[in-house]
Amino acid sequence: SLLERQMLEQTSAVAAAAAAKGVDILVTEDAVVASDPGNSGEASSVDVGAIPKDQMMLDIGPRTIARFTERIADAGSLIWNGPMGMCEVPAFAAGTNAVARAIAESGAYSIVGGGDSVAAVMSLGLADRFDHVSTGGGASLELLEGKVLPGVAILG
């Protein structure tokens, strides 16, 4: 994804609100990068602040995987929406696969949403280890926000 500079102010506000409530926001420390998704042979792991201009982030790196999976193991409930990287390319699926496995093994109440995340969970044979699986990623998040979904509204 490209950096959306217009979102930086909102991101700072969310980070400040989270800090005020004692909530940790986990961010990527390192990334698996390559100049093109088709060039997986040249992929390397670098700190996120050191991604070369001619490279793109295609997955989370090993330090980030370790930190995310450690925190997942301690969670009581988890909502996951969206893959960690370009998981449809095997060379860039490690982060998504590790998160899926960690959630499945965590024992936490777990929800996975979004087509790519659900596809990864299904391909790993882990769907039955999640409490709720929905291909509606954005819609799932809107429902959790309390928004009325058009398809649900018409029912009632």
Explain the meaning of each model-derived region.
Residues 1-156:
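Active-site loop-to-helix "anion-binding N-cap" substructures in soluble metabolic enzymes
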